């Protein structure tokens, strides 16, 4: 194949430039303006649940502002999912707090509710206080067992900051991911379901919290004619130009989600009955993943190969793949942090690959990808 097949490239609707041109024509080229307001309104309507949304410079910024508003600070502990990208945990460290890592369960690959409760009890026993927040992730767009996680959080009166950066449009029991916790986080990085070039959003419970979030995101400037600052603030607001890209992307969001699910369905059919290759799919009818990235596990015993050999061979054949996230409790930067593990994430990391699923991936591409994977795995 002459072309290279990528995991998930940005796909423009064709309407983005109109919103950007309007921003230039009206000189709204700053981190506020009509595009920002409209983009936030469109996201609010999409996620539902009477939530408000604040557009920000990154999903990482959204996590950081959520933690700040939950009062996370020096000496606190925040329970974090281990099997995920570092941006979920790093903002905890920004605040001088300590991430406590929880391993995954098999059904969704997300935070294990059983380990979560064990960890809460153990942290209370060892530190004399409960964790300040719980930060589950909907990995690769697969909803976590968020009902169980939220029930445990409510039992111990610990707020939930929900990382739905990879899960825009994913649902659990018909409710959008990112709307279950006190706060929810979205990402619009260049490889996500929609993009604003770079950007993110914080889903908040009400209008007053939205105003407070915007206050922190604009350097915590007080309402004085001069520049008055009584709290530490941040430069986290989204540009009106980037929000224009987001508005154009919102017109094809449903189409993007449908395409990712279609590609996954093709993979599901193609890998059915293939010994040694397991495609990750919804555990049951409560889960409705957006399948931001499709993921497979490669059993080295049954296939006679391993995920890294397959990755290298596919790369030579023009197919981009990526290993699954290396668990945070194995990362050198967090080597001394408390962790509660069951072996699931380490096993997944040593067996798994992300395979192409984005809007540019065609049905013919899927046929080629599957053929190449099967060819790599023949004993």
Q: Where are the model-predicted features located?
A:
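Phosphate-binding glycine-rich loop
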Residues: 32-77, 91-93, 101-103, 126, ...
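Hydrophobic/aromatic ligand-binding patch that stacks against planar heteroaromatic rings
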Residues: 90-92, 152, 176, 241
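Active-site phosphate-binding strand-loop segment of PLP-dependent enzymes
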Residues: 107-196, 201-203, 208
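PLP-dependent aminotransferase class I/II
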Residues: 34-41, 50-51, 114-118, 125-129, ...
